Amino acid sequence: MELAPDDVLNVGTGIPNDVVGPIITEEGMSEDVTITVESGIYGGIPMGGIDFGIAKNQFALVRHDDQFDYYNGPGVDVTYMGAGEVDAQGNVNATCLGPKPTGAGGFIDITTNAKHVVFCSSFTAKGLDCSFEGGRLHINQEGSLIKFVNRIKQVSYNGKIAREKGQKMHYVTERAVFELQAEGLTLTEIAPGIDIQTQVLDLMEFTPRISPDLKEMDMAIFMEGAPFGLREYIFSN
C-alpha cells in the first residue's frame, strides 16, 4: 500500500522482487509506476529467485554503473528491500546472516538515497508456516528464529541517520507493520486474526511503541483471488 501514482520504485532481491513486482503487475499498476532493478532494468515484470536482475518486457536497460548514478541522484521514490534483523532504533541487518557475511550489493547505496524505504520480511524465520482464510491470517507453525532483536549482528542500515535526513521508513511483515518514528520503532498495523500479545510482542526481544492509532491491515490482502483493489486504493488516497 506504500505507493503513489508516478512513483519510481526499486525492488531488492527476495520478497521485494519475488512478491512486490508481480503484485504491481497483477493489480494493473504497471503503467502507473516505474519498477527498476539495480542491474539496469526499467519497467516490465522482474524475475524472481535465481533470476533476480532480469525482467520480462522492460522498456529500458542501462549499464549497471549508470543505474547507480541514477540511484545516488537520488532518483528512487520508494525502495523495497529485505531485512534479516531489526532493532528498536530501526537499524537493519541485511548483510551478515548466519556464519558468513553475504555482502551488501546495492543495498547501502539504494537505501541511503531513496526517499522512502520499505523493508519486507517475515516476522520470524526458520519454520514459519502461514495461511489465510476469510480475510484472516493464520499462523500454522511459528518460526524458531526471532528477527526483531535487541542487538543486530551488523548495521547495514542506520535508522538514526535515516531519520535525521527525513527519510520515511516502514517495516512490513505478514502480521505486523512498523514505522520508524521519533520515539523509535512503532507498531502501526496488525493483521486480522493475529493476537498482538502472543503472536507479536512476545516474539520480539524489545517492546516497540504501539501507535495510539493502531490499525488493522486491510482484510482484502488476506482474501483469495486477484486483484484486491490496490490501484483503486492508491488513486483514492
For every predicted segment, state its role.
Residues 1-59:
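N-terminal active-site beta-alpha-beta segment that forms phosphate/nucleotide-binding
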Residues 2-10, 184, 222, 227-230:
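Glycine-rich phosphate/diphosphate-binding loops and the adjacent beta-loop-alpha structural elements
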Residues 24-27, 38, 207-211, 237:
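Short, structured coil/loop segments at alpha-helix boundaries
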Residues 45-227:
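Conserved phosphate- and dinucleotide-binding cores of soluble alpha/beta proteins
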Residues 229-237:
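Basic/polar N-terminal segments that are highly enriched at the extreme N-terminus
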